[in-house]
Amino acid sequence: MSITVNQIVLHQLVKNVDGDSIKMESVLRDELLSITPEVEQMMLQLHQGYQNKAKAFGVFQEKSIFAQHLNRLLEQEIEFLGFSQYSTKLLADELGKYNFVESGTLILCQYNFLATDYLFIALLDSRHSMLVDEHLDIRRTEYLDITQFDIAARINLTDLQVNANSNRYLTFIKGRVGRKISDFFMDFLGAEEGLNPQVQNQCLLQAVSDYCDQGELNKEQTQAVKKQVFEYCKGQLSNGNNIKLRELSDSLPTLNEQPFVVFTEEQNYGLEESIPPIRSTLKSLTKFSGSGKGVTLSFDAELLNTRIQWDPMTDTLTIKGLPPNLKDQLQKALKSEN
């Protein structure tokens, strides 16, 4: 699949330190980049890399300055270059409040992918390396790192314009622990948290469990339904698609003459029609897992009360029939002790 780059520009943010004072200065390009095959290939790589990142959803606050200028851009009141220059200065002012941010190249690109318009914004690092020139001499070079980036956001312009009540038109990369990347980028955009995929996935799991309970299913039947839900969600995840609530409901058995989607609506679970799947959360549909105090356990839910017994009084698990590789390790350890 390819993308269509409509407008793209690069600006630089340079960090200047004067004693305890930190200032981010912007070096602005005075014209847009020409859209060449190299530029399109770069944006395709950035698009694919962003798709694989862990992201959070956001929405613009009512007084967002960035959103006001974005709206002027979409209404064709200002040009993309002017919008990008203003946004760069706005980000520079915000970055000056943090001491962990370094210099970088800011890329702003308006592109189309699968009939959807996007605005992509990312702060990219530069890396130093070596190259061999035509005379076979070694020279130092500097290149833009488009494979590793964690300061980026993307706005679904199509969704923003078509659905004013959407809570997922803006996504941004979740910051690493100990760094407030998400914080300053949200402040720069004038945005706040929108859809929470983790909460949506957890509510979906609870709804499935409650649906089975109200249908008075036995253990085996409940596990079969949960496995069916998991297989559907896993398929959506593998294909890069969201969980479609009505589509999922159509694939499940109707319990007490009530489809699953109707049950979720009547019980007010607050589920979206389209839910971004989270693999780690969905695994609990078919597995029990946990770790702590040097122990990590994971096993299929159907094994509980068959091969695996839990005694809540003594807080112990009894496993009948260890995995061969684990058993082999234990036997070797026992022999070495003797």
UniProtKB/Swiss-Prot annotation:
Broad class of where this protein is predominantly found: cytoplasm
InterPro entries per record: Nucleoid_associated_NdpA (IPR007358)
Gene Ontology molecular function: double-stranded DNA binding; single-stranded RNA binding
Places the protein is found: Cytoplasm, Nucleoid
GO CC terms: bacterial nucleoid; cytoplasm
Keyword Cytoplasm: yes
Keyword terms, alphabetized: Cytoplasm
Assigned protein family: Belongs to the YejK family.
Name of the protein in its database record: Nucleoid-associated protein CGSHiGG_07705
